[in-house]
């Protein structure tokens, strides 16, 4: 995976394609490629990226990026589903209210929202209880109301 579109990322991507074609990689992808850079690489590539890892959360939903990625069958992956806890994320009133409705935490509501919108999530935690909580998001579905 290319972490960011800096330097000779075209050359790096070509090398990754060769590794993929040689069977040395099951998939190749990119990270932090926003729509303009992603379109460049998708049109340049012989093997379209399997995944694009970008900052995606409730406050930055990446709707345009998701549209472009879907057109090219590239999976969007959130590497920051909790916005790093910034902007008092875990105390957002509407998220707390939704969580109370479902008996879930703000983190679980945020993860479920992203999952329901086709976003693969990578929540970060070093606490075992939070890791377990992050897995417990498949027993409810958010509704429009």
What are these regions (language model features)?
Residues 1:
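N-terminal Rossmann-like NAD(P) cofactor-binding module of classical short-chain dehydrogenase/reductase
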Residues 4-145:
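Beta/alpha (TIM)-barrel catalytic core signal, keyed to glycine-rich beta->alpha loops juxtaposed to Asp/Glu
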